[in-house]
């Protein structure tokens, strides 16, 4: 319980009987990774509950009178629908409950994946993420394996020692692909080592349209104030929507579900048409 009398927090201890609408999570990282927390519900139930929550917040809690609310237009794709993901490197891999129970010392504690909720310096090693086209998984895992094999130092998110920091993958409906590797570089030999990694990525994945890199020697991960360098290809990719072409750069914002963005804009056009 929190200190506020109106707030109650609970955690599951035991299931006596599952709901008939309960779904089996399809991701091997479900329950540990902080994303996709509603995988135990079919997508149709997810959007139904989300609409109910918004309506309750406005009407029951906010006392706002609302007109009839149209149902949520769900995404046609519920897997591999994002066009952008950012992965984090860390020399402190999150150990699963099963690994902790084994009570052994693990030789490999580097990881690339997603931050663990409430543990900013630890990263869950991701083998397969269902959010983005599978090329994203293949690139991430290839970079990870190359870094393991050649002893690249992963960043320590507390002391800021190390080299490898982040990797961003952007895909598009045009088939173009952008990869951005972000590292901390303070010595010439580190830069040479970093460029070897970039060359490996370029050689292994010739389908990459835009291979970029950023040197970030700050304590935070923001890149908006940093220079972006082109290692191979263009400094941008293109996205298309209904005959319109959008130039997407490494710092650009574009709705992360490209197909659903078009659905949204069609609704806007419908409501604004005379």
Where do the model's predicted regions map?
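Single conserved hydrophobic/aromatic residue that forms the stacking wall/gate
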Residues: 1-5, 9, 271-274
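SAM-dependent Rossmann-like transferase core, predominantly class I methyltransferases
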Residues: 232-273
């Amino acid at each position: 319980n929190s200190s506020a009398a109106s707030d109650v927090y609970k955690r599951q201890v035991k299931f006596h009987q599952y709901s008939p609408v309960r779904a089996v999570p399809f991701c091997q990282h479900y329950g540990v990774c902080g994303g996709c927390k509603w995988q135990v519900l079919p997508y149709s139930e997810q959007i139904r509950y989300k609409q109910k929550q918004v309506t309750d917040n406005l009407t029951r809690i906010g006392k706002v009178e609302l007109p009839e609310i149209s149902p949520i237009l769900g995404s046609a794709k519920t897997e591999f629908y994002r066009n952008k993901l950012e992965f984090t490197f860390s020399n402190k891999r999150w150990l699963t409950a099963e690994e902790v129970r084994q009570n052994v010392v693990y030789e490999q504690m580097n990881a690339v994946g997603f931050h663990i909720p409430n543990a900013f310096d630890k990263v869950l090693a991701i083998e397969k993420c269902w959010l983005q086209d599978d090329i994203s998984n293949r690139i991430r895992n290839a970079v990870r394996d190359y870094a393991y094999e050649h002893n690249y130092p992963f960043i320590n998110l507390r002391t800021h020692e190390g080299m490898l920091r982040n990797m961003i993958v952007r895909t598009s409906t045009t088939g173009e692909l952008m990869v951005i590797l972000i590292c901390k570089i303070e010595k010439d030999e580190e830069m040479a080592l970093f460029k070897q990694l970039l060359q490996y990525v370029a050689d292994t994945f010739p389908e990459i349209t835009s291979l970029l890199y950023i040197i970030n020697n700050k304590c935070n991960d923001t890149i908006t104030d940093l220079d972006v360098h082109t290692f191979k290809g263009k400094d941008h990719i293109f996205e298309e929507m209904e005959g319109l072409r959008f130039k997407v750069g490494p710092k650009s914002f574009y709705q992360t579900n490209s197909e659903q963005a078009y659905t949204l804009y069609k609704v806007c056009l419908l409501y604004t048409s005379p």
